[in-house]
Amino acid sequence: MKRLFTLPFLATSLFAQEPNKDIKEGHSHNGHAFNEGPRQEGPLMRSTGNVHLAITSSWDKGQAYFNQGLGQLHGFWYYEAERSFRAILAHDPNCAMAYWGLSQANYENEKRAKEFIAKAGELLKKEDFKISDHERAYLNAEVAYHDDKKEKDATKRRKNFIRAYEDIVLNNPEDLEAKALLVCRRWQFNRKGIPITSHVGMDAILEQIFAKNQNHPAHHYAIHLWDYRNHKQALDSAARLGQTAPGIAHMWHMPGHIYSKSKRYQDAVWQQQASARVDHKHMMKWFLLPDQIHNYAHNNEWLSRNFSHLGMVRASIDMAKSLLGNPRHPKLNNPGRGSARYGRRALIDYLEKAELWQEALETVNSPWLEVLSKPEDDLSRLRLIGVAQANLGQQVELRKAIEGIEPHLTKFKVDQEEAKKTAKEKAEKEKKKEKEVKAAEKKAHDQFQKNIKKFENVVVELKGYLAAMNGDFKTAKEALSKRPSQQSPVLRHLAYGDHEKAAELSKAQIDKKDKQTIVLAKAIHALYHAKKDDAAWKVGFEDLRKFGSEVDLESPVFARLAPIAKELGYPADWRIAHKLAGDLLPRPNLDELGPLHWTPPPAPEFSLPDQHQKKVSLSEYRGKPVILVFYLGAGCLHCTEQMTAMADRYSDFEKSGLSILAISTDDITNLKDSQDNYSKGDIPFPIVSDAAKNIFKQYTAHDDFEDQPLHGTFVLNAKGQILWSDISADPFMDIDFLIKESRRLVSLHK
């Protein structure tokens, strides 16, 4: 719908505003909320879903971009939804529904959502502001939802929001988007204290949508709705969802939930691969860090897990390493969160599960599994060392592993006693009652107890293995009862001579029919050797053949089944080819969707002049890693702070084998000012001019919506690939992190 009035400034886009000198270079002129999110305009993708909600916009492409953003909202692709809605505002700053879209895209970021919808609220207050009643209903609902001054009770605001959307549906029964968003928020609010009273009722609303548009992306909400209630009800949606919005990775991911719960691991893996590939292709195009993408790390960890369930040992470990090889960022991804956390946990888990003991020992002393500063975070790596040494029969090395863990346990206990003493003395000094003194002591005690218990369990487990190596199976069994082996209790019972227990656990595992190949293979092996006359191991092997079509036959877990397979008369390759289920729709070729693993994208080449008009080319740095710093000229004070910090630490960069090249928005004549700003002589790295900002734009260090450059820091490897980046309203100032992460990534992506 075209806006029915014209204002003198209507044709003025956001990026044409007069600069405000009080705003820092790189910061948005439209408010703090605009400093985050995408700041580069993208094309119409035409792969984000067949959706439509009529809006009022003076821009001829406004409706198309709004529909794209709406489809991205349905796919929880919030980052890209912002890009679509910002594109509208860059051409039509009075499009209230674009602000609605930005607010919706920040459902999980209340502060930014309120800032965006407040902009729409200002427009609504204008007497001559003309939009449809339909749009006004959407906007009023969003404004009221975020108005915590008028209604402080968040639960009431959520209930009012649901009622407002019900009214939109009642007044506009053909509005499929209102119905879809109603179901979406109803499911989301279920997690916020407003339980769904009727899943069937919500599903009936979805069926109304699908009756009009069979391939509406609301299949996404059908999967969420039924995921934990009755997953089989969402099998049709699982088959369709990816094709409804093929450009959105999350829409390929979600069917994996349903197929995993249905134990259809081949189908789950296909979906999760599709999701990973679409994500990787997109992030490489836009120089995005993997963890900027919603649910990216969750998808790829689950993919690694399902690879393991299928017995695809190498694929499982490679995906775990892929997560660890992703670039890290202080705001997104570190050993305690995101890709790094998922990858570390998965790699340690699957090396042990697949019994790759030698590879495990090689990996724990490599950049893949670096030593973490906190002992409690590093415990899983330390434990893996001990488990691997035990399984390799290395008694001396196992003792060393135990001796490497015990001092941490001792320190936790000492610190616990010291904390209790301090807490007691403090409480007594404050003349607290005896009950309060004991409570203070207990609080101090409890903050250490979790870590103490974790370390005690590992020490008990490893000492049990050591006892078994010395023939003391009584102690080994006691340890096993206190601390069951995380991965292979059946094999431990078998090794300790407790065949009855090994047979009992193995048979129970075979009877579960959970289709997890590695666990089943161990159960078959254990039952065969513990109680061969029990035919359950034969049944288990026949099951394994049917759903183990992808297992790595040379992996230790499956290789030891070869004699059993021969005894049963199976061929050397005993796997039976997998047959696709009949409820699947046609699928695209996976390779066409993108690469399976994140691959550093090639850095755009350039050749720019320095202050002496000498051309400096990126190609000159080929063969060695380099850090590119995009800074906004000598007049930018916080840019100068970054340049000074990097110049002061230049020797540390050199020791790490890292060169630095700075690209400035200054013209050649003003480049010298940057040198003059540095009080300690000449800046020890080259500075080149990109006054036209062409290279800034190629590296996406540019706000296309407001036509201004952004701060950017990039790490390139010797092959000229972008390993890491930070593009922001502010320069990246954590120099220690930059050096450490650059070293790590360069070592992993040579």
Question: Which residues fall in each region the model found?
Answer:
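N-terminal alpha-helical interaction modules that lie
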Residues: E18-H219, H231, Q243-A245, K263-A274, ...
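Short active-site neighborhood of thiol/selenol oxidoreductases, capturing the structured segment around
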Residues: L618-M646
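Structural microenvironment flanking redox-active thiols in thiol-disulfide oxidoreductases
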Residues: T640-G681, K693-Q698
